Structures are given as structure tokens and as C-alpha cells.
From Swiss-Prot:
The keyword DNA-binding does not apply. PANTHER family: PHOSPHORIBOSYLAMINOIMIDAZOLE CARBOXYLASE, PURINE BIOSYNTHESIS PROTEIN 6/7, PUR6/7. It comes from Vibrio vulnificus (strain CMCP6). One of its GO terms (molecular function) is metal ion binding. The gene is purK. One of its GO terms (biological process) is 'de novo' IMP biosynthetic process. This is N5-carboxyaminoimidazole ribonucleotide synthase. It comes from the Bacteria.
Amino acid sequence: MHVLVLGAGQLARMMSLAGAPLNIQISAYDVTTGDVVHPLTLHLLGHGLEQAIEYVDVITAEFEHIPHDVLAICQASGKFLPSSEAIKAGGDRRLEKALLDHAGVRNANYYVIETREDFNKAIEHVGIPMVLKSALGGYDGKGQWRLKDAAQIETLWQEMAACIAATPTQAIVAEEFVPFQREVSLIGARGKEGQIEVYPLAENIHVNGVLSLSTAIDSPDLQEQAKHMFTAVAETLNYVGVLALEFFDVDGQLLVNEIAPRVHNSGHWTQQGAETCQFENHLRAVCGLPLGSTKLVRETSMINILGEDTLPASVMAMDGCHIHWYGKEKRAGRKMGHINVCGDYSGELQRRLCALANVLDEKAFPAVHEFAKKWQA
């Protein structure tokens, strides 16, 4: 089988690594340059998108922000999975909210803002405090504002109006502020015949809006809620592939915050922690193969490496530590790689995270240090 991935970043790279044992070949389309490249070396493959579409068996995507003309060409080929509808819902908060409502899953009360009058209505409908998010283009905490009191209204409106004016069809989605206890996510896969397999929930810790630490957890009640909502969304979309749902945990009740119609950062722990990783299961699904087991095989946490292109050599010598570099040029705040940390039981994982905190820079890895301080207190 030959799969073309729209996007040539780390997710396409890790799909390629996961596909090799199954004899699934991966090419990647760089939407920025328009080049078709090898996902590991990024070497040009010498042909364009239309040629690639002709010779591959399946087309999929590693991210949501794909030009609609590219999506249309791929969808028309009959080879694209999941559907362009799913990708668009992941890249436009208005469509995402409509999907969640249609699927009947809990999500924060919201109002769409395109004008100042809409903003006034949103304040009446949603109330203060509220969270305001750009409908298009926002990720990792970007394109977001918090309205905490009425004194901010004019200033925030000026910023949001500039955001709306800068991009055609842009809007702002106002959401009620949700006083959640923690953020969790569920990664799951749905096959062509409707088979669904979900991984254990992961608890996520963000720093400045960017995922820093993600740990697989055992929470039967939350797991049941999350699987029910995953199934509702996946079946509403007739989804094929891996899908991620991010939730707020509010006193034991889950609300969907976002969906990601693709393999997801909070599922990287599955590379060492699950029977079958999310990348392999995505390829299995879109290629029409049976889904692999999502069973937890060891306690695992994933630590994002942000803006750093080296680690202390001692990390490689630590038991249970697995480093995954993405081959990117160093840039402040950029996702350069991740570390999966494993233990045979919870206490062993916690001790290994604390050992890592002793050698990793606190400024670069604040979530690991915060975890260690709490665990050792």
C-alpha cells in the first residue's frame, strides 16, 4: 500500500516509521511549498500533487489547516480519508461546534461573533467571564482571548476586529468560561467497517497554551463518558482513521473542548505505552486493515521537547526513557521532539519522571519539574 499524507511534519514522519513494518509506503505533500517529499528525509520525489494522487492507494492528512482547493482535489479522487468534512470541522471552530451539537455531545455554551453587535449579543448569551477563540487558524493557545470583566470589552474588540479583518471568512467563537479541574484527551480509531478502538485517557498539562506533559490514566467513569462521546462524533462523521477528542473534566463530567481529525500530540505516548501506536492504527484504518489493540502495556508519560535541539546525554541512559526527534531546525517554542517515559507500574513511572527533572532544565521543561515537586512533597 502507498499512502499520501497532506502535510510533511513530524506526524507524517512518525506515520512513515509506523507503516514500514506493515509494508505501507508513505509520501508527504508539503502544503507550504507544493512539493511531494519523502517524510523522513524531506527529499523531493520529483512529481507534483496530481501525479501523486494518481499512483497512491490512499490519501490522508496530518493536520487540519489544508487549503480547500487541495482538499477538494483529494476528496474528488475517492481516495481521501477521513472526509474533507471532518478535516474542515477540525480547522473551523464554527463547524466544530455545529458538529458537536449535531452529535449530541456536551460542549461549552457559545456564540459566533462577526460584528460588534454580535459581540454584544455574545456577552448577553454567554456571559462574563468568557473565552474568545478565532474560528480559523488558532492552535496551541494562539488566536485566543479571555474576557474577565467589562473593562476589557473595548480593548478586546479592537484586537478581535483586527483578527476578523485580516482573514477572509474569519470570525470569533465566544465560549463560556469552564472552571475545569483538569484537561484530558481520548485518542481512538474507527475502521472502514465501523470498528472502534479507543486508547486509555491521557491527562494533559499545558504551559502557555502548549501541551507539555501527557500521561495515560486509569479512570473508568471518565473513560466510559469519553468513549461514548468519541463514538457519537465518529459515527456522525462516518469517520475512518484516528480521531482525538480533548475534554474538560468538570467535577467528574466531561465536556468536549476540541476535536482533531488526525493523529495527535497527546497520543504520542502510545508509541511505547500501547500494544499498537496511534500512527499504526491510523494507517490500518485508512488502508482497510483490522485495527490493532489499544491496550495499555506499560505506564507512560509523554514530555514535549519545545525549542531545544539537544538533551543531556544521561537521558539516553535512563531506564524507560525513549527520545523521538523530529529533525527540525531549532526555533523558540517549536515542537522539536518528545520523550516517552515508561514504567511497569505507576510508582516506577513517577520515580523516573522525578529522575528526569533532576537533569532537564526547569525553564525548558517546567511541567516535569512541577510534577516532581508535587510528587516529592
